[in-house]
Structures are given as C-alpha cells and as structure tokens.
Amino acid sequence: MSDPFVVRPRRGAPPEAVRRSGARASAAPREPARRRALPAHAAIDPLRALLSDPDVTDVFINGIDGLYADRGAGAERVAGWVLDGDRVRALAVDLIAVGGRHLDDATPLVDVRWEHGARVHAVLAPVACGGAAVSIRLPQVDLPDLDDLGRRGMFDASTGTRLEQLIADRANLLVTGSTGTGKTTLLAALLGRVPSAERIITIEDVAELRIHHPHHVRLEARQPNLEGAGGVSLARLVREALRMRPDRLIVGECRGEEVRELLTALNTGHDGGAGTVHASGIRDLPARLEALGALAGMDDHAVARQVVSAIGVVVHVGRGADGVRRVLGFARPVLQGGRLDVEELP
C-alpha cells in the first residue's frame, strides 16, 4: 500500500537576506538540508515521509478531520490523508508508545519526547471532541545561527547587531511570544554566540534547546510515574543547576513555580541568564508574569520587584501575516506605582 500522501519539496523565492557589515552582496547556495533522523519504530511509518521532510516544523492530526503540516508559513492541509476514528486513535496510542508512555481512557492526555528530539502530544476522544488529536513538534534538522535567522527575515542587520551585543554584555534576557513564533529558535541562536569558555546549563520541561556550543549541559524535567513517584520538576532542576557552577543559566520556558527559582538565580549574580515566556504581546507580559508568580506563592509586588531586578531586556517575537517569524520589539521591565509594567525600547 502506498503512503497516504506524497511529500514534495516546496520551492520558492528565499526571504530577503540580511546584509551584515562586510558581507558580500551574494552568498553561495546552501547545501540541501539532511533528512530528519527519526526513531526506527514501525508506528511512525504512516507519517515517516512527512516527518522526515526537513522543511516541516509541526504536524497535526485533527481526529478524522485531516492531517496538517507547517513548513514555516502556517499549517496547511495534507491532501489525500483519510483515516477513520478507530485508526486515528490507534495511531495516537502507537505514537505515544514510541516515547515510552501509555495513552488510554484513564490517561487521555499525554506528552512525550522521542529519541532525536521530536515532541508528541496526544488527546483521546471524548476529551478531543472530533477524535484523537495529535500534535508533533519537530526539531530543526540544521541548527540556524543568528546569521541564518537574519537571512530568513527574522530581523534586520541593526537588530542582529543589537542581539549580539546583548549576549556580549551578559544581559539577562526574557524572550517572549506566542506558540510557534520562534522563541526557542532565537534563544538557541543567541546562546550560540556565548564565548566557548563559558558553561551553559539549560533546563527544560521537554528538551528542545539545541545549541552550537562546546560546554552545554542539558537538564530535562521528568514526569512522575503512575504511582506519583519519581517526578523531577523544573523548580527542582533550577535549584540543582545552581550547584553545577553555571556561567549562564537558561530556563527553556517558564510555565509555573520555576519562575521563582529563575528570578532568584538571576538576582544572585548569575548574569547572562535567559528564559522564555508565552505572551501574545509585550504589554501582556506583566499579567503573565504575575500569574506565574502566583503559582509560586509570590504576590504581585514581589513579582514586580524580582522581575525588574532580574531581567534586563525583553525580546518579543511574533509571526506576521505572511507566516514569517520576526523580532517585533524590545522592552525592559519597570515599576509603575509598585506594580510591574514594561517600557518599550526604541
């Protein structure tokens, strides 16, 4: 039986390249990207051709309503994909099993990471009303550096220079944006500019940060088992990382009480740290941080004082109507009447 779809390379005009100081007006063509490495498990075979495509960043199965793929310009429906509800459910169960976890009616929402870095989230019916829903976030085949992101249109030359200076100055950074806007990609590229003599420790719920750096230690949280034992939280990992003599401490995404540990670390001499936070806009950030602080038992005034002291610059990213991820602005946290606010920077 043939695959239910055929993956064909998308060819189109490249984004306008950023002409950095001293760069030539034309660049040599980039070598074709490698195929993405995937687990050898047979459960992946129905999707293997699509998941192996280096241009694909995300794949979504919306129950019986179809299969979608994002190649960097928004999700598009994959033609020819037809599965009934039972087969979609079976596929979702199998995809989660590849990551070593169990998906069933008693545990209808599960998140796993495959070997080689793909992140898979699945929800079974009836929680997912239209049938089993699967979301697959794929690691990039080739790690883009800041120059690559500039060529792709994420920022112009002056913004690229500004970003590099923030790393050189050891500013504490918070990268914000909505889902799929390139927060992790930008942060990884920035960390690739850290001097090789410095020790970077990254802490993530699911390890996604891949960095071109010789001294990088990756820590990943662990969910508890069915008996509720064995879990290792992000907050615990932040505390442990402080004992590992980091030159730069990075929290991949602050989603809860770990924000307290990150702010404490950045307020005790660990300059050059960074994290990401989900926020739709720069002006939404204060409310988001207050909500995260509340999960850690911090009141709004404590959050405001800690954030203003710990975070030097906020870098906000978003996706334009054309689907291109861009740096949309810079800001710094400030106190306004004892409450947290942000001041946008020119």
Predicted regions located by residue number:
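P-loop NTP-binding catalytic core
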Residues: 70, 76-169
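Hydrophobic anchor at the beta1->P-loop junction of P-loop NTPases
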Residues: 175
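N-terminal accessory targeting/assembly segments
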Residues: 1-105, 111-114
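P-loop NTPase switch/communication element
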Residues: 141-151, 188, 192-239, 285-289
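NTP-binding/hydrolysis catalytic cores, primarily Walker-type P-loop NTPases
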Residues: 28-41, 306-310, 321-346
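Conserved lysine of the Walker
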Residues: 183
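Conserved P-loop NTPase nucleotide-binding/switch module
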Residues: 211, 241-316, 328-335
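Flexible beta-alpha connector loops of hexameric P-loop NTPases
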Residues: 79-80, 147-155, 216-234, 248-252, ...
